[in-house]
């Protein structure tokens, strides 16, 4: 893709993002206000997260699937019970580069929902984060927002292609920046990553989630390895007594998808 085409597409996304943000603020004003009110902060100066106990004899592992889908498509495919999706968040900026035309997972969630309109009402969360960067490994911090309204590919504002789901907003350790600027070792990154994954699952458990939609957490510009992330999630799901019924890893059809399929199927044998 030429730079000109890239720039044109980014400018188009910027325009669409601003239009979507303004439209949501008008059409979904009451729903946004309620979601803002019900959003909880975990970690740091927020709520403590109870650690889920080790599995008891006879406990079951959730039904785990890997789908070559983006998060929103997976949500519309799997949403039945109480469902939450993991937002692979920017640690310091609500919505990441949503209004700047970026197109990573968080920005795509914002384009298809009321999420951005909720995140911007929690500046204290991001201010605290900006003061506690932990050499770019960041910290175990999350926002849990209830009843975010999602639209199927942003195509309509009316049923049946509209639903509500919870969103767990959490940043993965940024190994790319941590190793380059903070002299963080691979072992230090792995320790932070595994604890972050456990933290995410514990927050979801604390909110009684039935269906949890995850994915290649931190495997883009943050530099995490998809195989390691897949094994990390699988490890905690097997070892701890989580009560999720279904866990879906939504990973678009790339090398990351192949790694997730390989590691999850290998771990299941």
Residue ranges and their predicted role:
Residues 1-269:
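Macrodomain-like recognition of ADP-ribose-binding/processing modules
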């Amino acid at each position: 893709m030429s730079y000109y085409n890239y720039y044109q597409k980014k400018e188009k996304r910027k325009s669409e993002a601003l239009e979507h943000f303004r439209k949501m603020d008008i059409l979904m004003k009451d729903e946004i206000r309620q979601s803002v009110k019900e959003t909880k902060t975990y970690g740091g100066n927020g709520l403590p997260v109870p650690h889920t106990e080790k599995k008891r004899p006879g406990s079951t592992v959730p039904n785990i699937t890997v789908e070559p889908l983006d998060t929103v498509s997976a949500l519309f495919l799997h949403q039945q019970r109480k469902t939450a999706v993991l937002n692979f968040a920017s640690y310091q900026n609500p919505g990441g580069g949503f209004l700047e035309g970026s197109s990573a997972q968080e920005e795509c969630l914002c384009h298809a929902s009321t999420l951005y309109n909720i995140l911007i009402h929690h500046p204290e969360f991001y201010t605290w984060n900006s003061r506690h960067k932990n050499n770019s490994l960041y910290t175990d911090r999350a926002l849990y927002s209830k009843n975010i309204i999602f639209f199927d590919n942003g195509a309509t504002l009316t049923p049946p292609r509209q639903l509500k789901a919870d969103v767990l907003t959490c940043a993965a350790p940024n190994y790319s920046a941590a190793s380059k600027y903070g002299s963080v070792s691979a072992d230090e990154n792995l320790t932070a990553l595994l604890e972050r994954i456990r933290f995410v699952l514990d927050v979801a458990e604390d909110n009684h989630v039935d269906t949890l939609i995850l994915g290649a957490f931190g495997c883009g510009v943050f530099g995490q390895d998809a195989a390691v992330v897949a094994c990390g999630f699988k490890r905690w799901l097997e070892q701890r007594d989580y009560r999720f019924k279904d866990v879906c890893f939504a990973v678009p059809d790339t090398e990351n998808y192949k790694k997730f399929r390989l590691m999850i199927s290998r771990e299941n044998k």
